[in-house]
Design a protein with these regions (language model features):
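Glycine-rich Rossmann-fold phosphate-binding loop(s) that bind the pyrophosphate
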Residues: 13-16, 181-184, 313
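Glycine-rich dinucleotide-binding loop and its adjacent helix/turn
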Residues: 50, 145-200, 204, 232, ...
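Short hydrophobic core segments
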Residues: 10-12, 117, 136-146, 180-181, ...
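Flexible, glycine-rich terminal cap/loop adjacent to redox cofactors
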Residues: 10-21, 26-38, 44, 51, ...
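FAD-site-proximal beta/loop scaffold in flavoenzymes
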Residues: 158-176, 262-335
Length: 474
């Protein structure tokens, strides 16, 4: 069966970038169609990414906190985990959110076509779905087709014991021993979940630190904590992976590499993601796709074809949902005739581990690369009353300032709920705040977020909660 649709805007992909673009188009009075390969809206993020991982991380955090309370006189005993019930709860979270999106699409009269969409011309798209073929004729298109996990040719990905992030989130079993390939955000988050559920976790990372994008001093605080949970093998890489009946055997080389191949019950490959740009027949619409699968756009999210836009993971790093959402708004607004641009000063990044690692703006590494003279100020959570009282004193808040103007240009927080505390730093950078602005803003006490104000006081030399190196000597 074949059907044909005519619309003002078609959005290819219904992840956070895609559905945000589609809903914004509808709100601006544009007839809009979404094409989505999943049976529900939300894309990778909501169905097999950001949201289910946070649901499982919440479970992991509660398990770890319950164990930690034994030192303070409250003993719950060993937790008994029922992974079927945990999985059911995770699916309930997803269903609630996807149902909400479906309701909003219906309320906005956004038509949803399920299936795999590919371009057949500059103004036509063909969708192969369970109910047959749908041809969509459009005036404007927004490509929001996302990304997928990287696969390496020497790894037997077809073996059910070799996982990508989607497999790990299915929570089919809890392996006794698990290897995480890649010390980035996804791998560390999944390692956190499975460690809490009882797995022995090894992490192999080719760089000299996990979370390579963050500054060393920030990661050092994090690493000190997670070494109690994970066996970290830094400056080490995997050279061979062999599937045998009794396990997955992994050979490594490097600074921390074991001499012999190691046997694992599961191997999580979390070495990054690749864009889906080559899977869309975009060339038939005249859209240029580079060798890696990325689609180049301008600040209005236009591709080289003026009426076709691209947003989200497919346009480049960072591959983050919140970046894609804002790009989607811009694309929709430009199509509607508004002169809007995607020009953020900062895009925050967060590892939702325990402790969380969050940063926004320039890191020290980036400031050096740009030739910017800067100074840093840090406030250790070991001096925070709220952190000590909450048993999370192994954290740190760091601010980076322009040396001449004293404006904040970057910041990082490592500690419990660090991602929830990062917003003030991002807003401060967007608004052009300097150290004095932050230091003179009265922060509630005792809180974790007051550490941002206290870090600014360290820079200003007005700190009284720490020894003051800038105090005048008598």
């Amino acid at each position: 069966m074949s059907t044909e649709i005519k619309t003002q805007v078609v959005v290819l992909g219904a992840g956070p970038a895609g559905y945000s673009a589609a809903f914004r188009c509808a709100d601006l009075g544009l007839e809009t169609v979404i094409v989505e390969r999943y049976s529900t809206l939300g894309g990778v993020c909501l169905n097999v990414g950001c949201i289910p991982s946070k649901a499982l991380l919440h479970v992991a955090k509660v398990i770890e906190e319950a164990k930690a309370l034994a030192e303070h006189g409250i003993v719950f005993g060993e937790p008994k985990t029922d992974i079927d019930k945990i999985r059911t709860w995770k699916e309930k979270v997803i269903t609630q959110l996807t149902g909400g999106l479906a309701g909003m699409a219906k309320g906005r009269k956004v038509k949803v076509v399920n299936g795999l969409g590919k371009f057949t011309g500059a103004n036509t798209l063909e969708v192969e779905g369970e109910n047959g073929k749908t041809v969509i004729n459009f005036d404007n298109a927004i490509i929001a087709a996302g990304s997928r996990p990287i696969q390496l040719p020497f790894i037997p990905h077809e073996d059910p014991r070799v996982w990508d992030s989607t497999d790990a989130l299915e929570l089919k079993s809890v392996p006794k021993r698990m290897l995480v390939m890649g010390g980035g955000i996804i791998g560390l988050e999944m390692g956190t979940v499975y460690h809490a559920l009882g797995s022995e976790i090894d992490v192999v990372e080719m760089f000299d630190q996990v979370i390579p994008a963050a500054d060393k001093d920030v990661v050092k605080v994090f690493t000190k904590r997670i070494r109690k949970k994970f066996n970290l093998m830094l400056e080490t890489k995997v050279t061979a992976v062999e599937a045998k009946e009794d396990g997955i055997y992994v050979s490594m080389e490097g600074k921390k590499a074991p001499v012999e191949a190691q046997r694992y019950d599961a191997v999580l490959v979390a070495i990054g993601r690749v864009p889906n740009g080559k899977n869309l027949d975009a060339g038939k619409a005249g859209v240029e796709v580079d060798d890696r699968g990325f689609i180049r756009v301008d600040k209005q999210m236009r591709t080289n074809v003026p009426h076709i836009f691209a947003i989200g993971d497919i346009v480049g790093q960072p591959m983050l949902a919140h970046k894609g959402v804002h790009e989607g708004h811009v694309a929709a607004e430009v199509i509607s005739g508004l002169k809007h641009y995607f020009d953020p000063k900062v895009i925050p990044s967060i590892a939702y581990t325990e402790p969380e690692v969050a940063w926004v703006g320039l890191t020290e590494k980036e400031a050096k690369e740009k030739g910017i003279s800067y100074e840093t100020a840090t406030f250790p959570w070991a001096a925070s009353g709220r952190a000590i009282a909450s048993d999370c004193a192994d954290g740190m808040t760091k601010l980076i300032f322009d040396k001449e103007t004293h404006r904040v240009i970057g910041g990082a927080i490592v500690g419990t709920n660090g991602g929830e505390l990062l917003g003030e730093i991002g807003l401060a950078i967007e608004m052009g705040c300097d150290a004095e602005d932050i230091a003179l803003t009265i922060h509630a006490h005792p809180t974790l977020h007051e550490s941002v104000g206290l870090a600014a006081e360290v820079f200003e030399g007005s700190i009284t909660d720490l020894p003051n190196a800038k105090a005048k000597k008598k």
